[in-house]
Amino acid sequence: MRLRVREFRPRTGPLEHRVVQPWHPLRHTTLNDPLGERWGYLLGDHDGLSRLAALFSFAAFSRHTIVHVPLRESLPRTFAPGVPVDLVLAHPSAGLRPSAWPRLRTRLRDGRPLTVRTHEERTAAHAADWHAEWERRHRRATEWLRPDVHARTLFLFGGRDVFAAAATAVGTAAGFGPLEKRARQGHDALVASLTPYLEPDHRWDRPEIDIGFQAHPPLHRFTPPGRPASRRRPRAASA
């Protein structure tokens, strides 16, 4: 998949960071703080979830790149509990500290256009590796997504395989969400979850992040899977 992004090279002291954002904002995708509420809900339409899955895939193979997905200003949903947050994906090797993010974020100016490519087969292979290890080690993996929230931003720190596995979960929501009965009626439908990939937390109120699908209105423009997108209405007869 080809994905248009903006690339920034801000500096903090002697360090230069590489930050990418989606070229067009995910206007119909929202996320709330999963640590404050103990339950996060990532809710999006087909376009938003598809591009977000590609961004997870890109993050998986970009160890020194910070992926920033602005979501706080997305259009509010009917059911969107809690405080809206942005999303940042990064490997530990990117050297990002959440406390340093507000200062770094103010320097994201004059980004240059860039087209990146994601490889679905490679992503699926590394996702399968993560799940195989998870099964082999009795639900104990060596890579997890470590969540943190600071300055109204959810940070997910992780490695290649767990980001790839998360990408497949988001992609599942994008692909199968439109088939849900609630989605066809215009409501949100819970389809997948990022919770299995979060760092183990044995407290009874461990944070969870679920993934939902909701087609944005007007619903008459939404084309269900299996129906040609180019289908046109019959033209009115001329007088």
Question: What spans do the regions from the language model cover?
Answer:
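Positively charged, low-complexity terminal tracts
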Residues: M1-A239
